[in-house]
């Protein structure tokens, strides 16, 4: 199977890296940024035109800006399978843009680069395409109407979580730890906590670590005073508002 990436931005690059070696060929296009050439050189693919992708690709990964859909769709006429990662573009509009094709709406996150991503999907796809997506992480089938809300959580969350890790590591360094040691401790703690959260509810984990009158309790009280929970709620709401214009 040959895959064609129409658009070679950060998210497309993350997915392509996660898929390295899993396709017979990788084709990349861009709008003149040079990213397609860079990705092709990095991953052993080819930088080509959208028309070339339409001729050769078995699966098209649509990763352009949403406003570019009407411009690129005619260049991809006749393609048989399309997976779109365009934010805020509903399945119905995608199906209208690619009549006769199997169209799948996908919202991945950057964890796909290391095959630990979350991918929300809706629409039609062959078992082969679904299996390829599953290589990149945890696939969840959701209603098309839920994509904006899901994106505000799983699509944006890696940045929010990375900010929390960065802040904790900086706090550790400010307290006297070597900065690299502080980062290592926080990153590994985050990874272990993520595994624990697979089998235990977040509230249970929080309570298990928090001894009455202890240092964790003091830290959580400080986070409450500074509005940590409200800040996350505000971040999700702001993300939704931006997506919806």
Predicted regions, residues:
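Short pre-catalytic strand/loop immediately N-terminal to key active-site residues, enriched for Gly-Thr
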Residues: 147-152, 203-207
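Internal alpha-helical scaffold of NAD(P)-dependent oxidoreductase catalytic cores
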Residues: 42, 93-102, 118-150, 160-199, ...
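Rossmann-like NAD(P)(H) cofactor-binding subdomain of soluble oxidoreductases
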Residues: 12-19, 27, 33-34, 38-119
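NAD(P)-dependent Rossmann-like dehydrogenase/reductase catalytic/cofactor-binding core
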Residues: 184-245
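Small-residue helix-packing motif on alpha-helices
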Residues: 26, 36, 69, 178-185, ...
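A generic structural motif
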Residues: 22-26, 137
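Extreme N-terminal starter segment of soluble prokaryotic enzymes
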Residues: 1-4
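Glycine-rich Rossmann-fold phosphate-binding loop(s) that bind the pyrophosphate
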Residues: 8-9
